[in-house]
Amino acid sequence: MAETLSGLGDSGAAGAAALSSASSETGTRRLSDLRVIDLRAELRKRNVDSSGNKSVLMERLKKAIEDEGGNPDEIEITSEGNKKTSKRSSKGRKPEEEGVEDNGLEENSGDGQEDVETSLENLQDIDIMDISVLDEAEIDNGSVADCVEDDDADNLQESLSDSRELVEGEMKELPEQLQEHAIEDKETINNLDTSSSDFTILQEIEEPSLEPENEKILDILGETCKSEPVKEESSELEQPFAQDTSSVGPDRKLAEEEDLFDSAHPEEGDLDLASESTAHAQSSKADSLLAVVKREPAEQPGDGERTDCEPVGLEPAVEQSSAASELAEASSEELAEAPTEAPSPEARDSKEDGRKFDFDACNEVPPAPKESSTSEGADQKMSSPEDDSDTKRLSKEEKGRSSCGRNFWVSGLSSTTRATDLKNLFSKYGKVVGAKVVTNARSPGARCYGFVTMSTAEEATKCINHLHKTELHGKMISVEKAKNEPVGKKTSDKRDSDGKKEKSSNSDRSTNLKRDDKCDRKDDAKKGDDGSGEKSKDQDDQKPGPSERSRATKSGSRGTERTVVMDKSKGVPVISVKTSGSKERASKSQDRKSASREKRSVVSFDKVKEPRKSRDSESHSRVRERSEREQRMQAQWEREERERLEIARERLAFQRQRLERERMERERLERERMHVEHERRREQERIHREREELRRQQELRYEQERRPAVRRPYDLDRRDDAYWPEAKRAALDERYHSDFNRQDRFHDFDHRDRGRYPDHSVDRREGSRSMMGEREGQHYPERHGGPERHGRDSRDGWGGYGSDKRMSEGRGLPPPPRRDWGDHGRREDDRSWQGTADGGMMDRDHKRWQGGERSMSGHSGPGHMMNRGGMSGRGSFAPGGASRGHPIPHGGMQGGFGGQSRGSRPSDARFTRRY
């Protein structure tokens, strides 16, 4: 219990600061938006049971509001305070390593806000704007605390509800004095509600620590009754704890604090050891105070807050109680704010001791958070002897006096300046107990200020002299002493009331003895003043556990409602506020002790990150697999698309080839069709020609048949008679003379029939020749011996014929018997046709016949002329000459040399057709 209470005191102080920073303005919020702390605060206002989980609390509150006739969906609460406390609670769950404090803060946030506001006003008096701790240790603590808070938030709420029930049971058993003290504490808390919310802790770590601390303080104040079991524990543990404290002294407390920090922040252990060597005396005093606080958790946190404000000589009992609570707050802030600083819990003790000098009980509080984590050790410390508690009181007073001049403000800081920078800067001129960088939360973007606590006032003065108006990070800084006296006076008033309370409770003195032992150790280290020691002893006596808690609350109500505690480890003032409902908080503080022990087994920050890392890696792997799968699908789709395109191209190429083949086939068929058409035309032409030739042959045959019919009687007569009859000879002569003397005997031919068949001269020639050959036989070749002799023979023949004819005409004798005129006529026809065939020149031109006629007339003798006419009519006997001419008419020749009845048939059809 003592440990829990001390832890609550620390966290309560920090929480008070956080809550006070939040304004107490009221606003409407939905029931579902309220946190467990808010729900319990509303239930407490309505005197309704506030134990149970969130769902049960919401049901109760809803029913209570409906009974009042209000709207359960909209509840009027201090909205700003709640919001800010919620922030800090989430952050302050970082210090939940000291889980006890955090739980208390959560439940009592409503009450704690009032106390915090009052303490914040004190901070304003000290010119503190928002406290934001930048120390390395504090930062580390914050991160660890966050992890712890996340893991144990649910457990804390449950433990808080259980602790409330336990506290209620204890309350009944507690002596009336304790109840009175609790009542006084509530009054003090109500007074503190007026505190301003100007200052807000900037640093996340510090803020979270403040809220849980505040809640713890509220629990301690409201549940002074709970201190009764603490008294029992303290009585049991007094002897062993006294032995432990006497033997170990500050070291034991440092070890406990280290354990606490290690549970919450395993890294802090090493730093704690380092700081332990530097501030061994201070840490010992703080440890002793913490032991007292642990014994009387309910009273001490409240008193500690008030005493923190008091720098010097107030009633020792009051100072110690207030200082213990304030120190608890400061320590909780340190734990939350300085993860790096946390590694040195002992160093914090030393720093807290420095603050205790400023505010007599400051030292008590810092060990309280450490001891809250190590609740068992705290219980043992409760059993320390009363003498030790008296010694502790003296040391606290000395510390408070000395700490008054150890604090100073640094203004004009750069926005990049951290608490570690200040610590490094001022450590050149002495040991820096604590350093913080704060700003005004109400005005965002406000300038930052530094609050530094040195181990001694001389070192602080040296720092002010050397570093005032110097440059840091490109900015001119001014260093001025902090004014802590008004707060100290208020805490002294509280201590007076606490002193009265101390007299009323004897059981608390056992815990005070334990504190005295611790104070003795601290006195050895810091050589505290005797007066302050006496005050601390008185305070220890007054605080026999829960009774001290009640006294602290009473003193707080009597003194200033707001108390500022100097966080000596960080050199920053911390506001501690006490709120109503402290009774329930006391039970919560016990639960928090157990929670803090559980938190000792809190996993490290890396372990907390491991599942997150694994989840991230899994998500990354899933994303990577999904992207790879998409890429594979894309590649497959592209491949299939390429294949489809290739197939389509092949199909198109095949179609083009097929079309080309078809086109070529069509062209071939067209060519064949044209060829066939051409052949068909040629065939038609050939057939036409054959038909025409056949018709011509028929005509020629007809003519030839008619001609022999006309000529046959003459031939028969000539053949039958060896000599021509006289009549015929006379007629023949007459005809010859008339025919050959007549110049135009060939001009009566029908020229229209002459070119009737010009294209078929060759056929006609052949046909006529064949017919003549058939008709006339083979007499010509036999007589004339071949075509080569034709010209001469014919000429000779014609010449002879002509001479013979003339002679016959002149003599009147028949022609010589050797000549057969009929045969000769036939032979002449053959000869003439033979010459025509040899020359290949058949011309039916009438002019040629005329020329022939003229040439014939120009010669002597009709026979000669006939022969020459035949030749000249052709113009040439070249074999390849044009063969357009007609063969010489048979009848013409015959008539030429025969003179046979030429005049009787001058217009014979044979002449026309022949030409």
Swiss-Prot record:
Residues 892-901 have a biased composition (Gly residues). It comes from the Eukaryota. Residues 67-77, 98-118 have a biased composition (Acidic residues). Residues 528-792 are annotated as: Interaction with POLR2A. Interaction with SFRS1. One of its GO terms (molecular function) is sequence-specific DNA binding. The modification Omega-N-methylarginine is found at residue 811. A motif (Nuclear localization signal) lies at residues 599-616. One of its GO terms (biological process) is chromatin organization. Pfam families: RRM_1, SAP. This is Scaffold attachment factor B1. It comes from Homo sapiens. The lineage of its organism: Eukaryota, Metazoa, Chordata, Craniata, Vertebrata. The gene is SAFB.
